[in-house]
Regions:
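Anion-binding alpha/beta catalytic cores of soluble intermediary-metabolism enzymes, centered on
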Residues: 1-228, 234-337
Length: 337
């Protein structure tokens, strides 16, 4: 059976992304990864790390499924996209900010055309892209804008001893002071609709059970610690329950992540970034992934950053990237079935 082609963007060239991608050489999992990046950079990083890899130039018309070279050496298909400036491990250069975005644009175009079944992204450095003069808050927002998608949902997921943990966010990269005003009834309703639809379509869960967090301590304590639960969250949950969605909450966030409550749901919806991701990353760091829900294409990512201090050392753990590639392939297979 032919494995789905997954575009893997190598991310910030000074970070750990390129060397994580090298670890996909000889990959025997559920996907055929195609690395998007500067071939000379990848070759140089492989040589510095002592990795014996055969690099093939990716050709869409003659891709083949060649994780192993004819000589038995681990191989990688590379779609070469040249750096804007030379790059050294651990040393950021704003000149390469546009290069990083070109990787994303090419992967997205390939997914939209059907050349790739999905895309998985290695980490980028938001600061260096902004220093290059391009406003950038993250992959999630960038891909939403590029696909003219009015609302997408950021969800991180990973396996724990008690089973899968999936945490979606109502708001993403916002200062904490701006969060309450951003949580409107319309935003919350559309976020829940996207989460529910993609848990069905991308994860194959027939009737998803979603646990919804409150915004305030103690979920507002009956209005004494905030009114958002009463005025925004509860009315939206009541409306969507009336349509048949299995929603529970709003829960106090500090108790929602306890095993007895998590066992009652297939996914959690947190109100803001650190409310949800602190618990998720504590439980799954290094093996968790990021999934963008609501896009017209499939996109997964690692759950960590560029780790400049590890770049070029060979010590970076590729587990999250491996899982991101595998999950992208599984989603693509469900979409086809």
């Amino acid at each position: 059976m032919t494995r789905p082609l997954i575009a893997v963007t190598s991310g910030e060239p000074a970070g750990i992304g390129p060397e994580l991608c090298l670890r996909l050489a000889g990959y025997q999992g559920e996907a055929h990864p195609v690395i998007l990046g500067d071939r000379q950079l990848l070759e140089a990083r492989a040589a510095a790390l002592g990795l014996d890899i055969v690099f093939f130039d990716f050709c869409p018309k003659n891709a083949g499924d060649r994780s192993i070279s004819p000589g038995g050496r681990p191989a990688l298909d590379v779609l070469h996209i040249p750096l804007a400036a030379p790059s050294r491990a651990g040393q950021l250069d704003a000149a390469n900010g546009p290069y990083v975005l070109t990787l994303l644009d090419r992967a997205l175009a390939g997914c939209q055309s059907g050349e790739f079944a999905a895309m998985a992204t290695a980490p980028v450095h938001k600061g260096v892209i902004n220093e290059a003069g391009v406003p950038f808050t993250g992959h999630t927002e960038y891909l939403a804008e590029k696909t003219n998608t009015p609302l997408v949902v950021m969800m991180l997921a990973g396996d724990t001893e008690r089973g899968p943990l999936r945490v979606a966010l109502t708001t993403t990269h916002l200062p904490l002071k701006d969060v309450p005003a951003a949580i409107t009834t319309d935003v919350l309703e559309q976020t829940l609709r996207i989460l529910y639809a993609d848990l069905r379509g991308k994860y194959g869960i027939a009737r998803p059970r979603i646990l919804v967090a409150g915004l305030n301590p103690h979920a507002g304590e009956s209005g004494y610690l905030g009114m958002e639960e009463i005025e925004v969250i509860a009315p939206v949950l009541e409306k969507l329950r009336g349509e048949g969605m299995a929603l529970s909450g709003p829960y106090p966030a500090d108790t929602m992540f306890t095993p007895p409550i998590l066992a009652q749901g297939d996914a959690v919806l947190a109100m803001f970034h650190d409310q949800g991701l602190t618990a998720l990353k504590y439980a799954t760091f290094g093996k968790g992934i990021n999934v963008t829900l609501g896009l017209p294409i499939i996109r997964t990512s690692v759950d960590h950053g560029t780790a400049l201090e590890l770049a070029g050392t060979g010590k970076a753990d590729p587990g999250s990237l491996f899982e991101a590639v595998a999950e992208a392939a599984r989603m693509a297979s469900r979409k086809q079935s």
